[in-house]
Design a protein with these regions (language model features):
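Bacterial N-terminal signal peptides that target proteins for export
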Residues: 2-13
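Bacterial N-terminal signal peptides
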Residues: 12-21
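Sec/Tat signal peptide C-region and signal peptidase I cleavage site
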Residues: 24-28
Length: 247
């Protein structure tokens, strides 16, 4: 798998999440982008049981077996299974990528995630809010404004230390690029960039990207959001323990 393919996978994973760092700086303004608007909501929905199974496959069974599971409905995410260990597994859609991601509205994206307790408490609320607003028909600028207002009013939590996201499902579809998938872990940090982690450097195994945008040019208000970076480290196994293509 090439580094560019890894970058594209990272972008589509978030649910966030992304690494087109230097390859598509003007993607949001590209008139040829393949998914300019939201598809009919039916195209984003899944069979209930299939979605639960895919969500659980994001992490090894030792983690996901006792995790809560949420599934997408026409109005947002709802709890399908109450867990015991504080983890939450779910299947993110394309709109959990950065707001200017070219595959933001890609209805094929199915990004299985399992969030540890700190991420479930402090990252997932943003996914709930974003999804609810988009499914209600709000535009991206309206969603951005609503999220900023919720942050300012402390209706959305600050990031907790130690927030981690497992994305090791063999069944995920993260992007139209490359082989569409790749197992990895993601770490959330209140950092403006990846310099302190040595991310995005030649031969570094760590990739990093801004959580909110590729380039703030399309949505300048995002520059006023709290700094949040996502760090990705590829792994060599799927969640079931079988070998995966090298990242």
């Amino acid at each position: 798998m090439t580094r560019n393919q890894i970058h594209s996978i990272f972008l589509s994973a978030l649910v966030l999440v992304a690494a087109l760092i230097a390859t598509r700086p003007a993607a949001a303004q590209d008139p040829k982008q393949p998914y300019p608007t939201m598809a009919p909501v039916e195209q984003y929905l899944m069979d209930h049981d299939a979605e639960i199974a895919l969500a659980r496959s994001a992490a090894p069974d030792a983690i996901s077996h006792d995790a809560s599971v949420i599934v997408l409905t026409r109005h947002g995410y709802e709890t399908a299974v109450e867990g015991k260990n504080g983890w939450v597994c779910w299947v993110g859609r394309g709109w959990m990528a950065m707001f200017d991601h070219p595959e933001f509205w890609n209805p094929k994206v199915r990004a299985a995630d399992c969030l540890n307790p700190p991420a479930a408490r402090s990252v997932l609320p943003y996914a709930y809010k974003r999804t609810e607003l988009l499914l209600a028909g709000h535009s991206k600028p309206e969603v951005i404004a609503a999220i900023k207002a919720a942050i300012d009013k402390k209706e959305l939590p600050p990031l907790e230390p130690g927030a981690v996201d497992y994305m090791m499902s063999k069944g995920s579809y993260l992007t139209d690029s490359g082989n569409h998938n790749g197992p990895h872990l993601m770490f959330y940090q209140t950092a403006k960039d990846g310099a302190a982690w040595g991310a995005n450097l030649t031969n570094s195994p760590i990739l990093a990207v801004n959580y909110w945008y590729i380039s703030a040019e399309a949505y300048p208000q995002l520059e006023s959001f709290p700094p949040l970076s996502v760090f990705l480290i590829g792994v060599d196994k799927w969640s079931d323990g079988t070998p995966a293509p090298s990242m």
